[in-house]
Amino acid sequence: MYVLLINAALIAIYGPIVSSKSKKVCVTLIGIQLFLLLALRAESYGPDAEIYAAGYRYISSLTFSQMLGALNPNILDNANLIYLYDFENGWVVLNWLLASLGFSYQGLIVFLAAVTSFSFCFFSLRYSDTPWFTLFILSTMNFLWYSISILRQTLALSIFLFGIIYIVKRKPIKFMLVILLAMMFHRAVILAALLYPLSRTKMTKRKLTYIFIAFVVLCALSAFVLPEVLKMILGVFGKEGLALSFSWN
């Protein structure tokens, strides 16, 4: 926790100073800082670290034919591996490739740190007027802990961020290809596909009012309908067991 606080403090100190001279230099420095923070953490750091590490060792023990045979042709389903290690196809392939190249689990962490830090910095530099402040906000709103804790979701998010340019340029096919690639690491990113049609919707006060009313109604009904809705949604991803139970106190 102290490391995360120091990281945010350093960005706040040198960010505005360096950015006033060169935004690219500033983002590069912050990117290196984020990379080191994510890459040099202990393998055991994070709530799911043991499962990911054990999964890496298990996948690394597979032969090429075994790994290939375990892949599921259905992108919305997991690879056909034993429970706890039956990750998405892309995650299985990535783990196997890095292990085959001689990298340990720490090598996977370093690879993910590089992709994550570069993706966040690329996104901030391209779409933010003050990229250092965007990265500062990212560092203070639990995104780094998110990046450390849930590796597959973070990789899927990082890939998705590269696809935003296709929303801006109005290239739906390329955008969906990026979404499909990201889904190979975590299927929940399919929800991000909604951003393309939403980005073309002009917001008015009336629409915002309707959205607010719908949100209030949804919150009021959530205790009654959310458990069943969650079961249906999570069922699509093979995660029915994660459905929560809601009740009024």
Model-identified regions with their sequence ranges:
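Start-transfer (signal-anchor) and selected internal transmembrane alpha helices
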Residues: 1-34
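Transmembrane alpha-helices of multi-pass, membrane-embedded glycan-processing enzymes
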Residues: 95-99, 108-119
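Membrane-embedded helix bundles of polyisoprenyl
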Residues: 111-114, 132-161, 185-188
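Membrane-interface transmembrane helices that cradle and orient dolichyl/undecaprenyl
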Residues: 128, 160-173
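Short hydrophobic/aromatic helix or loop-helix immediately within or flanking a transmembrane segment
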Residues: 50, 54-58, 68-103
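Transmembrane-helix signature of polytopic, membrane-embedded enzymes
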Residues: 21-29, 121-141
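Transmembrane-embedded, aromatic-rich helix segments that form part
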Residues: 5, 175-178, 188-199
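Alpha-helical transmembrane segments and terminal signal-anchor/GPI-anchor hydrophobic tails
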Residues: 50-53, 60, 196-249
